[in-house]
Each structure stands twice: as C-alpha cells, then as structure tokens.
From Swiss-Prot:
Record field: catalytic activity: adenine + H2O + H(+) = hypoxanthine + NH4(+)
Positions that bind substrate: D276
UniProt protein name: Adenine deaminase
Record SUPFAM superfamilies: Metallo-dependent hydrolases
Length: 317
C-alpha cells in the first residue's frame, strides 16, 4: 500500500520549510557556518525529537533554524524538501517560511528569500514540482512586528501567493492580527492561518470572519462545534490537516483517535500534509500510510484526500 500511496499525484499545502531541516543537513550547516550545536551527533538529536506539546517542539525548531545563515543554506534546505516532493509524487507544494525567525537573528529578508525562491524555480524546471510560497507571521510576536515583515515583503510581492499565521497558538488568537491581514489583502495577498490545532473552535471562527482566510491550517478542533462544521462543509473551506504532527504534539493521544476520516466522510474538504516532517517522523506519503495503518483508510478515501489537496491549491494550474 505504501508504494501505491507514494505514486498517487498529490499537493502539499501545509509544510514549514524550516521544519523540513533534517538532522544530517542541520549538522552539515552547523559545520559550514562554524556553529556549536548542543547535540553530539545526529542520533542524539533524533532522540531529542520527543515533544509533549507545541511549545516544546517550537523551542527545538527555533534552535535548529539558527543554523540557517546564508542564501546557499536556504537554497539547500528548500532543495532537499523538493527532492522529497519528487520522490513522493507531490506535484505541487505551497510551503510556508517564517521570515521573522531569521530577520530577528540579523539575517536579511532578501537573503532568506533569494535562497528559497532560487530552489523553488529550480524545482519547477529540473524536477517538475510546481509551487507557491506563503509568508507566515509568528503569532507569539506582536502585530506591529508582523507589519514590519509585511513592509519588507512588499518589494518582493510577486514571490508570494499568500500570507499566513503560525507558531504558538494558545493565547494568540487570530484577532490579534486583523489589521496586518487587512493590509495584506489590500496589497493583493491571499490569506491562510493556523487555527484549531491546540486553540479552540473560536479561533477558527476568528480566522474565517476577521482574517478572511481562504484555507484553515490544521482545524481539527472544528469538529467540537457543529455550527462551524456546517459552515466549513457548506462553503467547502479546505483544512490542511497534519496527522503525524497531531499525534507527535499530543493533539490526539494516538493516530487511532484522529478525526480526519470522520471529517472527510462528513463532506469536509480535508487534505493530508506533513507540517514539519524532519521533526514528526514523515513526509506526505508517511502521513497517508499512517491513516491506512491506524484508521483503515481505503484506496477511495486516499484518492479523495489527494484530489482535495489538488483542488485546494491557491495557485491554480
């Protein structure tokens, strides 16, 4: 079944480039940039990839991202991910990147962007993988800081298809960022946002009504609010769900409890994605395979999930 799932044409709509930084590449970048890491070797680092919640993961995620310093580093990171896309028949990807993670460390915005977009262009020409880049604001920082990031992005607006919102969800509702999302939309950007992962269904309502998003990233807690579920079904608002991430971060205790197939059968436009695959133990095919192994996903369900991902693209073919 793995090979069949791997061959299925699909899109990935919820992937953080910084979260695809595999330990081997992290160590190579640290050596290249003469950065001391708190882990002795790749295996020690892999053992550190045990999280009880989103914040524990984010602490490690930001520590790893510190090894990314140069345009070549960002190119290598993005290219390594695109090679995985090619291996797994991901024909289209819409990855996130977090400029604030890097500009706050003194890395110029244009250095980060040049490395990523250079790889995405090569991914199209050399691998046949289409893409659309999403600039994501960090919600644990202020709206004013997000606005500064938007200002930095405007000279390069053609490089992006949308702006998004990620990082620590609890205590940072979408309403905190209404003004910057209004500005982004007025500048022609589409909008997406993480909501309803650890946060309550109210955060999803806010993302829809205040940020006016085209797509909900995660959204698994929508099932707790029947009125919200009906709206998502009626309006066919896509959810970019990340099963392995949800179990690694204890949103669900184990994969057998995941609600993605329940939502699919109710008519929700759910999609399968890997989120931060280097940290969560698998890319898109591994996420599909986990649904087959633990939830008994059928071939028909897999085809519908894959088609949903292609239908939910912001960048239309």
């Amino acid at each position: 079944m793995y090979d069949w799932l791997n061959a299925l044409p699909k899109a990935e709509l919820h992937l953080h480039l910084e979260g695809s930084l595999e330990p081997e590449l992290l160590f190579a970048l640290a050596e290249r940039n003469k950065i001391a890491l708190p882990w002795n070797d790749v295996e020690t680092l892999r053992k550190a990839y045990a999280f009880n919640n989103l914040q524990e993961f984010l602490d490690l995620y930001y520590r790893g991202a510190d090894a990314l310093r140069t345009e070549q580093d960002f190119y290598d990171l993005t290219w390594a991910y695109l090679l995985r896309c090619k291996e797994q028949n991901v024909i289209h990807t819409e990855p996130f990147f977090d400029p604030q993670t890097h500009t706050d460390r003194g890395i110029p915005f244009e250095v980060v962007l040049a490395g990523i977009t250079g790889a995405l262009k090569d991914g199209k020409s050399k691998l046949g993988v289409d893409s659309g880049l999403i600039l994501s604001f960090l919600r644990h920082l202020s709206q004013e800081e997000a606005e500064k990031t938007l200002d930095q992005a405007l000279p390069f607006r053609d490089a992006f298809v949308a702006v998004g919102l990620d990082s620590s969800e609890m205590g940072h509702p979408p309403s905190k960022f209404q003004r910057v999302f209004d500005r982004a939309r007025s500048e022609g950007f589409l909008t997406v946002a993480h909501a309803g992962e650890e946060g309550p269904p109210e955060y999803i309502w806010e993302a829809l009504d205040l940020l006016k998003i085209q797509r909900i990233d995660h959204g698994v807690r929508a099932i707790e609010d029947e009125r919200l579920m009906q709206r998502i079904i009626d309006e066919q608002i896509p959810l970019t769900v990340c099963p392995l991430s949800n179990t690694k971060l204890c949103v669900f205790d184990d994969m057998a409890q995941h609600n993605i197939l329940d939502m699919l059968e109710r008519g929700v436009k759910v999609t399968v994605n890997s989120d931060d695959p280097a940290y969560f133990g698998g890319y898109v095919t591994e996420n599909f395979h986990a649904l087959y192994t633990h939830l008994g996903m059928t071939e028909d369900q897999a085809k519908r999930l894959a088609q949903n991902s292609l239908d939910a693209r912001l960048v239309k073919p």
